[in-house]
Amino acid sequence: MKSYMAKPEEVKRKWFVIDAEGKVLGRLASQIAKILMGKHKPTYTPHVDTGDFVIVLNAEKIVLTGNKLEDKYYKYYTGYPGGLKEVQYKKLMQTKPEFVIYHAVKGMLPKNRLGRRMIKRLKVYRGSEHKHQAQKPEKLDIE
C-alpha cells in the first residue's frame, strides 16, 4: 500500500472565520497556523501547500496571559546604525492589533517559500466585519 501524496491541483481550499475575542494569543495562533498548513486535513502532505484560508475577527480583543502586555516588547531593526527599536505590546495592541496576531502566526509557520505562501491566506481584522462574504466562510470555534 502506497502513502498518499497530495498534488497541488487536487487541493480544495475552504474559508474559515475565527472570532478572537477573549482568546489567548499563543493558543489561537498555533491553531491558526495548523489550519494554514493544512494539518487538520487527512490529505496533509508536508511539501505541498494544502492549507485553508483563515479570517480572524476582533483582533483588538485578544488576551495575553500574565503580565506580558506590560513586559513583552516587539523588536525590529530599521537598517541604520543604532536603529534597533522596541515597541511595548500594550502600545502595539492599541495601534496595530492585526499585526500582533499576524506576527505570532508567522513565527509558527515554516521559514521557507511554502510558509510565505501560507501566511498570505491569513486575513486579520479589528472589529467584527470583513470583506470576504462572497467566499461563504465557515465559522470555526476554537477554545
From Swiss-Prot:
**Gene Ontology CC: one annotated term:** cytosolic large ribosomal subunit
Entries under SUPFAM superfamilies matching the protein: Ribosomal protein L13 (SSF52161)
UniProt keywords (A-Z) are: Ribonucleoprotein, Ribosomal protein
**Any one GO MF annotation of this record:** structural constituent of ribosome
Tell me which Gene Ontology terms the entry assigns under biological process.
negative regulation of translation; translation
Output the superkingdom of the source species: Bacteria
Pfam families in the record: Ribosomal_L13 (PF00572)
Task: Describe its partners and assembly state.
Answer: Part of the 50S ribosomal subunit.
User: Into which family does the record put it?
Assistant: Belongs to the universal ribosomal protein uL13 family.
Its biological function? This protein is one of the early assembly proteins of the 50S ribosomal subunit, although it is not seen to bind rRNA by itself. It is important during the early stages of 50S assembly.
Protein name listed in UniProt? Large ribosomal subunit protein uL13
Its source organism is Thermoanaerobacter pseudethanolicus (strain ATCC 33223 / 39E)
Q: What is the lineage of its organism?
A: Bacteria, Bacillati, Bacillota, Clostridia, Thermoanaerobacterales
Q: Which gene encodes it?
A: rplM
